[in-house]
């Protein structure tokens, strides 16, 4: 059994007193290699693994029951948040894996994205890798996503920049990577990204 994220804790209000921002203190962060776990988090859920298996089956990379893995992924995702799947949802258009292969991939990616909403980097990578949900790319006006130091001019960030300490501690490899991948800016398209 995994430990629940602090965001899922029933004590969240008492921990943060209704505020979701605080200055870094030992209650929020640990110095490197000091102390124990403070806020354990989920790295990958059972839902995510079932959605990825369903995707692999639809793409022909694996064999099995894509619809079954999709349904199991939905169940795990909803159970994680304490929500039961109703018969109405289970039989709905979004609750079943039907349609063309592209429509199936869109449904799977969208559900993976929803299931990862507390894991922003993973959700961002899902959109970058699959192009779904398309609305995440075309309708977001969140300045944290869109402006990113003003260099994006309203576009969706294609990649994250290397941290400045990497240039001092690993300059040769960073320069080689930039030569292969393109400029170290958020607008540089990544080889693996669909969008």
Please provide the spans of the model-predicted regions.
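Active-site loops and adjacent core secondary-structure elements that bind or stabilize anionic groups
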Residues: 1
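Acidic/polar-rich alpha-helix caps and helix-coil junctions
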Residues: 4-195
């Amino acid at each position: 059994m995994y430990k629940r994220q602090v965001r899922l804790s029933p004590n969240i209000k008492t921990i943060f007193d209704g505020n979701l921002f605080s200055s870094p203190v030992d209650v929020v962060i640990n110095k490197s290699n000091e102390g124990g776990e403070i806020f354990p988090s989920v790295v990958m859920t059972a839902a995510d693994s079932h959605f990825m298996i369903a995707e692999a089956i639809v793409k022909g990379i694996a064999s099995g029951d894509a619809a079954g893995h999709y349904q199991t992924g939905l169940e795990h995702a909803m159970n994680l948040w304490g929500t039961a799947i109703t018969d109405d949802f289970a039989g709905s258009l979004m609750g079943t894996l039907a349609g063309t292969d592209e429509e199936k991939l869109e449904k799977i990616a969208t559900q993976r994205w929803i299931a990862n909403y507390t894991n922003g980097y993973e959700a961002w990578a899902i959109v970058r890798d699959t192009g779904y949900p398309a609305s995440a790319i075309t309708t977001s006006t969140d300045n944290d996503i869109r402006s990113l130091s003003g260099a994006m001019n309203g576009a969706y960030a294609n990649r994250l920049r290397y941290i400045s300490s990497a240039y001092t501690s690993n300059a040769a490899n960073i320069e080689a990577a930039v030569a292969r991948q393109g400029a170290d800016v958020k607008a540089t398209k990544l080889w693996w990204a669909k969008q």
